[in-house]
UniProtKB/Swiss-Prot annotation:
Enzyme Commission identifier(s): 6.1.1.21
A GO CC term attached to the entry: cytoplasm
Keywords: Aminoacyl-tRNA synthetase, ATP-binding, Cytoplasm, Ligase, Nucleotide-binding, Protein biosynthesis
UniProt GO MF annotations: ATP binding; histidine-tRNA ligase activity
Presence of keyword Lyase: no
Catalytic activity: tRNA(His) + L-histidine + ATP = L-histidyl-tRNA(His) + AMP + diphosphate + H(+)
Name of the protein in its database record: Histidine--tRNA ligase
Length: 408
């Protein structure tokens, strides 16, 4: 037996846990300002939920999924991302669109653990279904920018955006890339050789040094836009300008999944090393219909909570306790009732059961208590308590019935 976490997983304790919950709760609060409704899916799904949606050229499908056969022989996968499961939810529950859904929780990918990347990680996830207008893209990017500002990290995170265009654009661009990369086929990495057959756009996403110089001279997708694609992208860029959201058009940005069309974007930073994306997403108008639903335009993005934790400065507001110090058997019995009463009035209470008065007062100091309530037989008979202000050292006698009003 080993008493260590599995590689690529982390425990969360104390301040780190509070930081985690702060991010999750902030995202939930901001999402509601934009009309998002909460949605939660299981952490595992039938494997085909992901294989049918993510594309067989994606690294997630080829290398990273945690899949297993259950006792009934059915192939099950721990979710590697949220969109596929949310699409399954949309279809299964026959949700009416347009609709905006917010979700959060753990996801799992078999990757090399490093800063900002774990095998179990947590995401905040936003999906908009049923709106084809580019204003939905603008609003979603604005929401992401709002979150970054709320977290206090917007100055060090930059927006990169691209458009993959419509189906006609992607088809023409795919053909151009096949022609271009075929000339360098022998020089490409093994992954890119496989992608050349399955989805040449994914080569543009390669981080392999062997591919980078070849990619730098590859055709630009903007040369293949249809008028509709160009107009759609132009409206989004104009909207970002109106909202004063700075951006850089990155013609090589394609994202790591096969279902994207039109808008793709990432909010990136150099503060995370190689794992620079804080938020990432895009439009996927054909995904729902490709897995058995009706045609439903959609756009979404996700962010890694652990990555945000690496970037933000957050210290939880310290909650200072009230220390109960009963002296004697009868006082100890009454302390249970008093502790119960104080806690139900929203106060943080530590009931110190044993030790000398001096020892217990020392512990109250160590716990940074704001007040100590001290009582024995004398106080019980007079229905009073002695309260000590731990900051000033001031002591006074108060009526037992007025305890709440006299807490410092």
């Amino acid at each position: 037996m080993t008493n260590q976490t599995v590689r690529g997983t982390k425990d969360l304790l104390f301040d780190e846990w509070y930081k985690f919950k702060y991010i999750e709760q902030t995202a939930n609060r901001i999402s509601s300002l934009y009309g998002f409704l909460p949605a939660q899916t299981p952490i595992f799904e039938c494997t085909e939920v992901f294989t049918k949606t993510l594309g067989d050229s994606s690294d997630i499908i080829t290398k990273e999924m945690y899949s297993f056969n259950d006792k009934g022989g059915k192939s099950i996968t721990l979710r590697p991302e949220f969109t596929a499961a949310i699409v399954r939810l949309l279809i299964e529950k026959k949700l009416q669109t347009p609709i905006k859904l917010f979700s959060t929780g753990p996801a799992f990918r078999y990757e090399r653990p490093q800063k900002g990347r774990q095998r179990q990680f947590h995401q905040i996830n936003f999906e908009v279904f049923g709106i084809e207008d580019p204003k939905a893209d603008i609003e979603l990017i604005s929401l992401a920018q709002h979150l970054l500002t709320e977290f206090g990290i917007n100055k060090n995170v930059k927006l990169e955006i691209n458009s993959l265009g419509d189906g006609e654009t992607i088809t023409k661009y795919r053909e151009a890339l096949i022609l271009y990369f075929t000339k360098y086929q022998n020089d490409l990495s093994e992954d890119s050789k496989n992608r050349l057959i399955k989805n040449p756009l994914r080569i543009l996403d390669s981080k392999d040094e062997k591919d980078k110089s070849i990619i730098s001279d590859a055709p630009k997708i903007s040369n293949y836009y249809t008028k509709e694609s160009s107009d759609f992208f132009e409206q989004i860029l104009n909207g970002l300008t109106i909202l004063d959201i700075p951006y850089t058009v990155n013609n090589k940005l394609v994202r790591g999944l096969d279902y994207y069309c039109h808008t793709v974007f990432e909010f990136v930073t150099e503060d995370l090393g190689a794992q620079g994306a804080v938020f990432a997403g895009g439009r996927y108008d054909n995904l729902v219909s490709s897995v058995g639903g009706k045609h439903t335009p959609a756009i979404g993005f996700a962010g890694g909570i652990e990555r945000i934790m690496e970037l933000i400065n957050y210290s939880p507001k310290e909650e200072r306790p009230i220390y109960l110090i009963p002296i004697g058997r009868e006082a100890e019995k009454h302390a249970l009732t008093l502790a119960n009463e104080l806690r139900r009035n929203g106060l943080y209470v530590i009931y110190e059961y044993s030790g000398t008065l001096r020892t217990r007062m020392k512990k109250a100091n160590q716990a940074n208590a704001k007040a100590a309530l001290i009582f024995g037989d004398e106080e019980l008979s007079s229905k009073t308590l002695k309260i000590k202000n731990m900051d000033t050292g001031e002591e006074k006698i108060i009526a037992r019935d007025n305890t709440i009003e006299n807490i410092y």
